[in-house]
């Protein structure tokens, strides 16, 4: 891959057993292990990609979903560029816990502007037949909690896995572009000492 690569840190968050490790491994190694164990603490993998002409190194952090590992995972939230809130469509409780994960991340990552932070919501395990959460319910949650993109994925059969991580990159790039636009539009007239132009920040 040629050209300067942008390093982006992405955090996978959600209850234990929703398939965060499987999503990461499917995306980076294109492998699926049905016997995978729960993550203890954190793990991360890198993958280089190109999205809309931008070269990116995606650093994907997979976190332990169990409450007893909270002290191990939360220090790694800082510096994250995007958060993938993940639940399993066949586990109602994992969906209902999304709000708690969102709040935990915002607090421990010290997010300064939660309304504009790029969250992406993933409904994983769509290969399962006994789903407990409908697409419409998940989309409604996303609209109510920040108008987040929602994607349904399956690490097992590789449904929307690449699309999900590329969407995360697009969300980060969109926020950065908006910030750059704000800074360019917010200029200072040195002669008068007053600010000229407009700001969208």
From Swiss-Prot:
Binding positions (GTP): 18-22, 33-34, 36, 38-39, 65, 124-125, 155-156
Motif (Switch 2): 64-78
Record bears the keyword Hydrolase: yes
Reactions the enzyme catalyzes: GTP + H2O = GDP + phosphate + H(+)
Motif (Switch 1): 31-42
Keywords: Cell membrane, Cytoplasmic vesicle, GTP-binding, Hydrolase, Lipoprotein, Magnesium, Membrane, Metal-binding, Nucleotide-binding, Phosphoprotein, Prenylation, Protein transport, Transport
Signal peptide positions on this chain: none
Lipid-carrying residues in chain (S-geranylgeranyl cysteine): 200-201
Known function: The small GTPases Rab are key regulators of intracellular membrane trafficking, from the formation of transport vesicles to their fusion with membranes. Rabs cycle between an inactive GDP-bound form and an active GTP-bound form that is able to recruit to membranes different sets of downstream effectors directly responsible for vesicle formation, movement, tethering and fusion. RAB9B is involved in the transport of proteins between the endosomes and the trans Golgi network.
Family, similarity comment: Belongs to the small GTPase superfamily. Rab family.
Subunit structure: Interacts (GTP-bound form) with SGSM1; the GDP-bound form has much lower affinity for SGSM1. The GTP-bound form but not the GDP-bound form interacts with HPS4 and the BLOC-3 complex (heterodimer of HPS1 and HPS4) but does not interact with HPS1 alone. Interacts (GTP-bound form) with NDE1.
Domain-related comment: Switch 1, switch 2 and the interswitch regions are characteristic of Rab GTPases and mediate the interactions with Rab downstream effectors. The switch regions undergo conformational changes upon nucleotide binding which drives interaction with specific sets of effector proteins, with most effectors only binding to GTP-bound Rab.
UniProt-recorded name of the protein: Ras-related protein Rab-9B
Gene responsible for this protein: RAB9B
């Amino acid at each position: 891959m040629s050209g300067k690569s942008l390093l982006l840190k992405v955090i996978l968050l959600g209850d234990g057993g929703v398939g965060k490790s499987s999503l990461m491994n499917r995306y980076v190694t294109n492998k699926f292990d049905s016997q995978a164990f729960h993550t203890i603490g954190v793990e991360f993998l890198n993958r280089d990609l190109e999205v809309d002409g931008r070269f990116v190194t995606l650093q994907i952090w997979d976190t332990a979903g169990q409450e007893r590992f909270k002290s191990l995972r939360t220090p790694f939230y800082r510096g994250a560029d995007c958060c993938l809130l993940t639940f399993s469509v066949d586990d109602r409780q994992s969906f209902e816990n999304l709000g708690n994960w969102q709040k935990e991340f915002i607090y421990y990552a010290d997010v300064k502007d939660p309304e504009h932070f790029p969250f992406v919501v993933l409904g994983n395990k769509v290969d399962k037949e006994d789903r407990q959460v409908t697409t419409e319910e998940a989309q409604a949650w996303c609209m109510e909690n920040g108008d987040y993109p929602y994607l349904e994925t399956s690490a097992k059969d590789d449904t929307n896995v690449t699309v999900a991580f590329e969407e995360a990159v697009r969300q980060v790039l969109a926020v950065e572009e908006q910030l750059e636009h704000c800074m360019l539009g917010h200029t200072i007239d040195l002669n008068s000492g007053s600010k000229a132009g407009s700001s969208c920040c």
